[in-house]
Amino acid sequence: MAPQMGYDRAITVFSPDGRLFQVEYAREAVKRGTTAVGIKAADGVVLLVDKRITSRLVEAESIEKIFQIDDHIGAATSGLVADARALVDRARVEAQVNRVSYDELIGVEVISKKICDHKQTYTQYGGVRPYGTALLIAGVDDKRPRLFETDPSGALLEYKATAIGAGRNAVVEVFEADYKEDMNIEAAILLGMDALYKAAEGKFDAGTLEVGVVSLQDKKFRKLEPEEVGNYVQQILEKHKETENKE
């Protein structure tokens, strides 16, 4: 039996070198998930997901990876779909409880911390397992866009631009080179799609992409219609076609 086997099976026991293996395995589930992207712009915040449909028999509309949490908050998920759905439902309840209790919209950071607190409890009690999903939570409060990432351990980080899922490294590489804090929502969408294009090695189209935005102007979350997504995708495809022709 391998030396780490006992620590491998127990969620509540640290290994001698300070690791919780089940939490690490939950992170691996996220790394194998679809690529989700979040970008803060000067006038809002953007979420994009490549739904990575594996069969032409699947109805693309039945796969949802971007969700509305409240009027001004959206979330993108990667990892185990059922786990993500449970966390999204919990976040929606928290948002409604805050609205009823205090007669005001919940803060983006507040809802992110509540979800992280819940995820953290599933790393320290027996008889449960960590959530095998990560969330990008995006919204607008205090007259500025916010973007947070929650991981299976319950850790919380705020980003200007980031990604989760299988294509994370490729996407972050693009962001580090091309992200600008003063870009608008349209430019952020194009940057996100360009990063997803490179992460997917050009294997994407409007039918596999989901895009959500929260504008600083109206503080409303909305998902782009397929026609809008298609227009952005066409711009990206034309851009890369021109680049290939020049080469």
UniProtKB/Swiss-Prot annotation:
Main location: cytoplasm
InterPro entries found in the cross-reference section: Ntn_hydrolases_N, Proteasome_alpha, Proteasome_alpha-type, Proteasome_asu_arc, Proteasome_asu_N, Proteasome_sua/b
Regulation: The formation of the proteasomal ATPase PAN-20S proteasome complex, via the docking of the C-termini of PAN into the intersubunit pockets in the alpha-rings, triggers opening of the gate for substrate entry. Interconversion between the open-gate and close-gate conformations leads to a dynamic regulation of the 20S proteasome proteolysis activity.
Compartment annotation: Cytoplasm
Keyword Protein biosynthesis belongs to the record: no
GO molecular-function terms, A-Z: threonine-type endopeptidase activity
Superkingdom of this protein's organism: Archaea
Entry keyword set: Cytoplasm, Proteasome
Any one GO BP annotation for this protein: ubiquitin-dependent protein catabolic process
A GO-annotated cellular component: proteasome core complex, alpha-subunit complex
Alphabetized Pfam families for the sequence: Proteasome, Proteasome_A_N
Family named by the database record: Belongs to the peptidase T1A family.
Summary of subunit composition and partner proteins: The 20S proteasome core is composed of 14 alpha and 14 beta subunits that assemble into four stacked heptameric rings, resulting in a barrel-shaped structure. The two inner rings, each composed of seven catalytic beta subunits, are sandwiched by two outer rings, each composed of seven alpha subunits. The catalytic chamber with the active sites is on the inside of the barrel. Has a gated structure, the ends of the cylinder being occluded by the N-termini of the alpha-subunits. Is capped at one or both ends by the proteasome regulatory ATPase, PAN.
HAMAP family named among the record's database cross-references: Proteasome_A_A
Function: Component of the proteasome core, a large protease complex with broad specificity involved in protein degradation.
Protein name: Proteasome subunit alpha
Organism in which the protein naturally occurs: Methanosarcina thermophila
